[in-house]
């Protein structure tokens, strides 16, 4: 009787172990977002969301790098790569390569931030006196190529194209804007705010913005600064990073979770030259 009881116990334990193993394989691991009801199209188990009217997140895997955006200043290159959300089993490593001596040479490898899906490359002692081709790479097939322009110090005047308020009432392309601006060939692009009007879905809206305008900054430096709608409120009076108690932001500060605000800032400003004031403000913003 003891013998049979022992065998049955072992069989029962084996079934439990096999079942647990199967369940663990069926439950993908992901980094839990530090906020709720925000950026839902891009966080947690994003692949289970319904198709968004903003942009389709489930792109072919050779297209997961949406765009790169950069500035150069004081011999420092800062380049951000924006990715579409990655599946749990996909690599989080992104590479930056320069085209030198007729070959692509990887100069830096960085880890993508799963909250917002952006990654920053920083190259110091960068030679700003000449053009250089760059390539951002993920996995075996995904890449985005562009050109880092030399510093136009030999020009008496530099030209800047300034844009703002990219309405979400029209989610179509911006081909005519891009064509006309590229014809003028400015030295610098400046987006002055409200790149997104989708208050609670910044990553999706930022990806949409990038696909609409990336041919402007694929081959020239670009400044982007967030405004009120980018961080999800009607007005933005920063007031040192204080917590706003009103959705419109009219009492000053930031209404949404500070990690959401920081995600927006990371996506839109990480590639900008180093700030004069580097210390974090209230709420870590």
Each language-model region and where it sits:
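Bacterial N-terminal signal peptides that target proteins for export
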Residues: 1-10
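Hydrophobic helical h-region of N-terminal Sec-dependent signal peptides
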Residues: 11-16
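C-terminal motif of bacterial Sec signal peptides marking the signal peptidase cleavage site
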Residues: 18-21
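Metal-dependent phosphoester/phosphodiester hydrolase catalytic core
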Residues: 27-285
């Amino acid at each position: 009787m003891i013998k049979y009881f022992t065998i049955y116990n072992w069989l029962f334990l084996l079934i439990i172990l096999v079942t647990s193993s199967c369940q663990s394989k069926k439950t993908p691991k992901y980094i839990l977002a530090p906020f709720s009801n925000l950026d839902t199209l891009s966080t947690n188990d994003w692949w289970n969301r319904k198709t968004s009217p903003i942009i389709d997140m489930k792109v072919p895997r050779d297209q997961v790098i949406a765009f790169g955006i950069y500035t150069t200043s004081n011999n420092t290159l800062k380049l951000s790569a924006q990715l579409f959300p990655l599946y749990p089993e996909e690599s989080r490593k992104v590479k930056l390569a320069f085209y030198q001596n007729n070959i692509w040479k990887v100069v830096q490898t960085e880890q993508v931030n799963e909250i917002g899906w952006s990654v920053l490359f920083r190259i110091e002692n960068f030679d700003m006196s000449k053009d250089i081709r760059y390539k951002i790479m993920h996995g075996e097939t995904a890449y985005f190529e562009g050109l880092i322009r030399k510093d136009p110090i030999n020009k008496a005047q530099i030209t800047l194209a300034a844009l703002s308020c990219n309405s979400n009432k029209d989610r179509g392309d911006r081909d005519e804007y891009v064509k006309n601006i590229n014809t003028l060939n400015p030295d610098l692009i400046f987006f002055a705010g409200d790149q997104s009007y989708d208050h609670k879905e910044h990553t999706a809206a930022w990806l949409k913005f990038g696909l609409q305008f990336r041919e402007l900054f694929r081959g020239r430096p670009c400044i982007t600064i967030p405004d009120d709608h980018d961080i999800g409120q009607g007005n933005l009076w920063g007031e040192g990073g204080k917590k706003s108690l009103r959705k419109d932001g009219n009492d000053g500060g930031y209404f949404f979770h500070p990690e959401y605000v920081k995600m927006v800032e990371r996506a839109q400003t990480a590639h900008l030259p180093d700030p004069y004031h580097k210390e974090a403000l209230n709420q870590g913003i």
